[in-house]
Amino acid sequence: MIINLIFAARKWHNFNINPLYLTYVQTNIMQTSLFHYCGSEWKKHTVSQLAENTNAQLVLCFGGKEVLQKPGIYAVVKEQFPAAEITMCSTAGEIYQDAVQENSLVAVALQFEKTTINTASVNIADHQNSYDAALALAGKLPNKGLKYVMVFSDGRLVNGSELVKGLNLVTGKDVLVTGGLAGDGADFKSTLVGLNEQPAPGKIVAAGFYGDAITITHGSQGGWDIFGLEKEITRSESNVLFEIENQNALELYKKYLGPEAANLPASALLFPLYVTIPGAAKPVVRTILSIDEERKSMTFAGDVP
């Protein structure tokens, strides 16, 4: 596998969740509202037709870890949306309207006229690996009429590549799957995810959208500038990188970072790797989840085979 030590320099803030576009036919009304919770106060911004708090089917919550750790934060959200399925996911920055927020909570409330939604969750601790956890998670969603699966996962304990493989195997090629891994700001310690409960580490949640009255498309865009020479990975295991061209990967990474190496692991957010996977249509950016000084290894959000 060929990589650029990206040392892709960061142009934009790096978020874990790709943009998603829910397109509905004219006979299926979709109502969407955006909420911001900060300092014990709620603010509302209507995205399309107003989604009523009491009738919202699904509420997607993204927040700073400090906010999601507060006892009773789930109860605060549930009080606002009593009938909704509620997902919660920690971030490295929350987007509200056109601005990036930190240490707050942003909630997206969705309400459909004809589309039904089912949800499911698993704990990675109950499964041998991320692939098995994905199989179990997808198996909890009814298959009949399934159109789309939105997934949010622990970002420290889960291998994103294996998660996607398992989900796609169960759902099949005709069902779109998008989502992302939870963030932890610049701390690299633990992430929080929850479904209809106080969020906790190790959780993976999914929301399935059903019926022919909805069409889903998706897109993503990166903002990285690539620099550094192309090099070949010579030793790795799944999403753990050990050697690049027979050199210790962590030491080589630190060499490229220069003074920024002193700020690891936080500075790793600014310098992911640009990876060319054999047989893949195009290269991917791999975000670093952690570094291990004893093993001299680096763990990424997805495979670096």
Predicted regions and their residues:
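Acidic, Ala/Val/Gly-enriched low-complexity intrinsically disordered segments
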Residues: A8-A9, V25
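Small-residue-enriched flexible segments
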Residues: N28-Q80, A84-E85, C89-P305
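Residue-level recognition of conserved structural "scaffold" positions that shape functional pockets
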Residues: I17-P19, A186
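Hydrophobic alpha-helical elements and their junctions with loops/disorder across both membrane
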Residues: F15-N16, L141
